[in-house]
UniProtKB/Swiss-Prot annotation:
UniProt entry tagged with the keyword Zinc: yes
Documented EC number(s): 3.4.24.-
Signal peptide region: none
Gene: htpX
Localization: Cell inner membrane
PANTHER family linked: PROTEASE HTPX
Name of the protein in question: Protease HtpX
Active site: 140
Positions with a binding annotation for Zn(2+): 139, 143, 215
GO biological process: proteolysis
Protein family: Belongs to the peptidase M48B family.
Amino acid sequence: MMRILLFLATNAAVLIVFNIILSLTGIRGQDAMGLLIMAALFGFTGSIISLLMSKRSALAATGAEVIEQPRNDTERWLLQTVHSQAEKAGLPKPDVAIYHSNDVNAFATGASKNNSLVAVSTALLNNMTRDEAEGVLAHEISHIKNGDMVTMTLLQGVLNTFVIFAARMIARMVANNRSSEESNSGIYFLVAMVLEVVFGFLASMIAMWFSRFREFRADAGSAELAGKQKMIAALKRLQAIHEPQEMDGKLAAFAINGKRGGFTSLFLSHPPLEKRIEALETSK
């Protein structure tokens, strides 16, 4: 429900800005509507394709192997724990995979709750107790339960649409104010490209802010599924080992770890570990 409300609210905001720009520039609504449709087509296509391919892409990027038949006690425990938590959360059983990495991490991905994946690194299994790992797994199950993959796709699609539309509308306004029609085309594309970079930069800040908000929700969900102390213990273990590195690409948005920074923290997908621990410790 929340992702639908977010989608509607964000689109309403885009339409408001759309009408403001039309009134300020005097550009005909028919032309602007065509541009908006084009921007939405480009803005959502990439995000939706990425979502549909997310599971396969994640397996390929990490070299993770899906557990079909457990080969040892660790794999058996991992499979049983994930499936038990999924059942408790009212979800279908996700695929479970292990990938080789020196980084203590885990992530969830997939196009829907019915086609999801939970993957953990070998370093996590080797460096965490089972209680701590259970907290991490519950965190990932919470991402799936909350529909975070779909929510981020919708948000990214709206942001992409706004970036393309706003950049090209402003570029059109600048180009139309030029006296020489011969240079209009070059000015238009130059301004559009520069503004798409600038607006894309700002859009990334919005997407990462929402990602950090979503991490707090997944932590709270883990506390409900596995117990608050297990999630706190897992986060403290991450602190004790090291401040984990950010994962590459889109996988970072659904991983367990996070690191802090000054201005760069605005572009991190996760809040600082100490803030996540504090939020859990002060929650009821």
